[in-house]
Every structure is written in structure tokens, then in C-alpha cells.
Amino acid sequence: MTWADEVLAGHPFVVAHRGASAARPEHTLAAYDLALKEGADGVECDVRLTRDGHLVCVHDRRLDRTSTGAGLVSTMTLAQLRELEYGAWHDSWRPDGSHGDTSLLTLDALVSLVLDWHRPVKIFVETKHPVRYGSLVENKLLALLHRFGIAAPASADRSRAVVMSFSAAAVWRIRRAAPLLPTVLLGKTPRYLTSSAATAVGATAVGPSLPALKEYPQLVDRSAAQGRAVYCWNVDEYEDIDFCREVGVAWIGTHHPGRTKAWLEDGRANGTTR
């Protein structure tokens, strides 16, 4: 089913933002495993490069907020990062490990989990910029996707991977090197996402924050007229889920994939948009 088909059905896809990150520590195997079990249609992650060139799933430049360590991700090796714990800060964490695996998650491990799942799931990978290693991030990402056989899909609609960034240059690098990979240009203002930026870099979708989309809901129709879908992120409240469905958002990024999926399914079963 294409993005357009899903929108016409009145039922956006649900993307687990950093996994089921309300219930489990973000960017951990525990969070993604729960998201998949809850029926997420896609999972989202942020990636950063380690000092020795490995892609790891960490949002912040620094380790302080989500790990037992401190300092910059980019200055540490994979081995050093693996010595840290990434779940102790979260309310769900238990000393006996019953909360699930909250060790460092590499992109390799996450892609393996998604591709081995018993149903098709997309993985949305966000590259962070500006960073120490610049375009090497996209080069490493494309090499990894090629290794898994998902960098050159038969069509954008059938792609198992989607690459996103707030950096227009990063989106352009992906489009130039892998033209069939879907890409999302992220932004926090409707002015930016309705400018020529998305067209200039060939983005197949735009990704407004929820406040940006609420400020200018016409962004969905304007994007559709240009052949682009809309991915809206941090959509957690029921009224906001309904809003996204009503304006035609294709993908909803949420910290609560299970309840979001259930809310959408219930609305479709009842033939309502609430």
C-alpha cells in the first residue's frame, strides 16, 4: 500500500518515535521490541557516528541525558559506548533487567530486528547535523543499507527504509546517491517546508512538527500537489491524532505507538474520524 493509498483510506501509518519511548527508554532494543509488538507500522531512530566509524542510535550529541556516561558520542569508540547503561534514567528500568535490553543499540542491530520481524515494518533513520563527521554520516548509512539490501528498492513505496534530516544538504546527498530511497526533509516552521527547499533537494516527503502543522494545516494539500507526503512528529494526544488524520497526514510519529494504533483502528472500524 502506498502512502497515498493509506491517506485515502483515512488511516495514517504509525511510526514509533525512538521506539515505544514513553513506556521504555528511547533508542533501546526494549523500546523498539515493544513498539513492534504493539503493532507499529514503522520505527524511527536518530543516528550518530562513533569515533571509530560505527552508527549508533543516540539522539543527543552528549551522553549525559540518556546514559550513565558523559561527553560527546562522536569522541568515543563503540567499545567505550558499550560500557554504559542506557536505561537507568527511565521509570521503567529495573535492576534485574526485566524491563528489557537497554544496552547501547547500533543501527545494525535495529535494522536486523526490523527486517527479521514477522511483518513488513519501515525504519525511518534521521541523520543529525551539524556534526563532527559531516557527510560521512550519510556515506556510512548508505553503506549499511546496501549491506542489508535495502538501499535500492524497486520503488519508493516498497522501500523498507526512509532517510530523514533537518539538513537539506543531507537529504540531497541521499537523493543523489540513492534516488529510489524515500527521504523526508524535517522542519519546525511551515514557512521553511513550503519554500523551495524540499523541491530543490528532491525530498519525497516533508516532516513538520505538530505545532508547525497546526499553524498551517494547508501544508498537507500543498505538499500533495507537489507529489510529497507528510510525516508529522511528536503526535501523542488523541485530539492531535484525529487532527493529523483529518488533514491527511501519511505518517504519525508518536511516543505511544500502541495506543495511537488502537485509536486509529477503532475510528476506522466505526467509520468515524471522531
From Swiss-Prot:
Q: Name one GO biological process term.
A: lipid metabolic process
Enzyme Commission identifier(s)? 3.1.4.46
Q: Name one Pfam family in it.
A: GDPD
Catalytic center at which residues?
17, 59
- According to the record, what induces this protein's expression? A possible member of the dormancy regulon. Induced in response to reduced oxygen tension (hypoxia). It is hoped that this regulon will give insight into the latent, or dormant phase of infection.
Which reaction is recorded as catalysed by this protein?
a sn-glycero-3-phosphodiester + H2O = an alcohol + sn-glycerol 3-phosphate + H(+)
Per UniProt, Ca(2+) binds at 44, 46, 126
| CDD domains, per database record | GDPD_like_2
Q: Which PANTHER family match?
A: GLYCEROPHOSPHODIESTER PHOSPHODIESTERASE 1-RELATED (PTHR46211:SF13), GLYCEROPHOSPHORYL DIESTER PHOSPHODIESTERASE (PTHR46211)
Name the record gives this protein: Probable glycerophosphodiester phosphodiesterase 1
Name the gene.
glpQ1
